[in-house]
Amino acid sequence: AEREVYRVPEEWIGYGTWVANSDCTKLVGIEIARRDWTPLNDWKIFHDFFHKGPHCRLLRVDLKTGESTTIHEEKIWLGHPIYRPFDDNTVAFCHEGPHDLVDARMWLVNEDGSNVRKVKAHAEGESCTHEFWVPDGSALVYVSYLKGQQGRTISRFNPDTGVNEAVMNMPACSHLMSNVDGTMLVGDGSGTPVDVKDTGGYTIDNDPYLYAFDVAKKAYFRIARHDTSWATVANSRQVTHPHPSFTPDEKAVLYSSDKDGKPALYIAKLPEQPEMLHA
């Protein structure tokens, strides 16, 4: 039977993805004040919304009682809240907006709202994007790229030591995800990023492939072509983005594409004898 656990209050708008903890007993999410809200139907509006400095709050919701508690609140566009797996006290979130304009994208906060801390200070011309927790909770992995460069870097942050490190170079993938322990990653080849202000400075060639990355070997291989258009469809900016992830047995990859005309889900099996490449 279905039941309503929580309803966003009238004066707020629920934004982005809301993510459960490992036990699926609670969620973290972002709400934006309705008075500041603009429907983000395309990337031009996305850029303009950043400069508005909307009133946002990061909250948690108890999935049993529906009780909500504000963890963090400020007049900065917040997004991408994610519990650290198996550690409910640690929540990651981001400062949303064009990656070359945000002060620092990735942040952590304790679940009680204390100890707000920056994951990484951006280097000159550096953009960081699509951070995610390795499913075992061991690291926060993200994509880093520099203005004027075609390639990108897979990096990771250890929340226990506070150390950032570059893992390996890679082709220009937009979204990464890992297997359970972070030894294998999967990414989607992309083109010039739309979520930066200076698109001219970040122009790159389009890449239509899905890639798997072997972290120990610092090498990668092509899985299949995704051939998505990256287009905004029906006012949804990310419905055509591949966002690949491994199947539970790690033998195939699930992804989205509109290569056949409409956005759809596909599964591509990993090759049995892949050709290993180096960036």
Explain the meaning of each model-derived region:
Residues A1, D62-G66, N110-S114, N158-G162, ...:
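Short loop/turn segments that connect beta-strands within beta-propeller blades
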Residues A1-R57, G66, T70-E73:
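Asp-box/WD-like beta-propeller blade repeats and closely related beta-sheet repeat scaffolds
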Residues V8-G14, E74-G79, H122-C128, N169-H175, ...:
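Short coil/turn segments at the loop-to-beta-strand junctions that recur within blades
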Residues T17-L27, P81-V91, E131-V141, L176-L185, ...:
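Blade-terminus and WD-like Trp-Asp/Gly-His loop motifs, strongest in beta-propeller folds
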Residues G29-G53, C94-D103, Y145-K147, G187-N206:
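Short, conserved, GDST-rich strand-edge loop motifs in beta-rich repeat architectures
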Residues A123, V167-M177, K218-S245:
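Conserved blade-ending motifs and adjacent loop-strand segments that build the rim/top face
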Residues Q149-R152, V167-R222:
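Loop/turn-rich, solvent-exposed surfaces of beta-rich toroidal or solenoidal domains
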Residues T240-A279:
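Blade-level signature of beta-propeller repeat domains, shared across WD40, Kelch, NHL, RCC1
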